[in-house]
Every structure is written in structure tokens, then in C-alpha cells.
Amino acid sequence: MEELGRNVDVSIFRILRFMNLRKYIGIDNEMLMYYFGKELSKNLNFKNFKELSNFYKEYKLGRIEMVSENPIKIRIYDCISCSGLPDVGKPLCHFEAGFLAGYIENVFNKKCYIIETHCWGLGNKFCQFEVRLVDNKKSENCFASSGDCNGYFGKNRTKKL
């Protein structure tokens, strides 16, 4: 590992990230990336936002900040998945959504719904996620770009600033 280094070029990460997995294994990469991120975050078992923020910084995933705690809004600058990409009319950060959902669910011991409201893919210069805690632990997970979370966030929540 010392000879190879710890860093992977962002273009290699994005090639893997945006591959058409449905063509090869019959699964949408959006949901797969969401669950990869969620599982990774749950296994890392961050105890607080500082640990999460330090991990993002150390592994060069982006710069993360808590915008508000009620409702929970988390912003990522220099996001590894989308920073610098053109406006494609949709959010792109499924891995990050899952990663944040795993963190939130560990800390609060509740399921959550998460929506990416800002993204380079939507024409913004940062990513922002809004989280809603769900009291019922048996409720379905939901990342709003893959469904409407039963209307939990209302309509047209993705926007440009």
C-alpha cells in the first residue's frame, strides 16, 4: 500500500460510481451506491458529527458541515461524487445519502428518510441533504431521488440556489 498510496483518482472513482450496473447485474447503481454508503457508515459506527467530518476530510470525500439540526440539514462541499460535474437535472450523490443515513440511524437509533436538495447535478456548487427521523423502526428506508418517501418531503424539494 505504501508504494501505491491511499488515494484513488477521482475520475476512476466516478467511472466505477456511474457505471451502468443494471446492464451487468440487473441492479440500479443508485440504490446499490445508497446501500453501500449506508452499510459502510453503519460499520464505521461514528459516535458524533466530528468523527464523521474527520473521516470525510481524511479520505478526501469532501468537506462536510451541519447546516441545521432541526430539521437536520447536512452540506458537502467538494463532493467526490459530483463536484465539478455539469447540471444534469437530478441529484447524483446516492453513496453520500446512504453514508449520511447510516450515520444518522446509528446516532439516533431510528430509521430516517433522506433527500438531496442541492447537488452539482442540479446546478448547485455544493450538495445538501435533508433528513427526517422516522419513529417506526420497521419503516422502509427512503432516499427521495429513488422514490417520494410516501410524500414525506412534499413535492419539488430539489432546487437550485
UniProtKB/Swiss-Prot annotation:
Gene3D superfamilies: Trafficking protein particle complex subunit 3 (3.30.1380.20). SMART domains: V4R (SM00989). InterPro entries: DUF2507, NO_sig/Golgi_transp_ligand-bd, V4R. Belongs to the M.jannaschii MJ0150/MJ0739/MJ0745/MJ1460/MJ1642 family. This is Uncharacterized protein MJ1642. It comes from Methanocaldococcus jannaschii (strain ATCC 43067 / DSM 2661 / JAL-1 / JCM 10045 / NBRC 100440). The lineage of its organism: Archaea, Methanobacteriati, Methanobacteriota, Methanomada group, Methanococci.
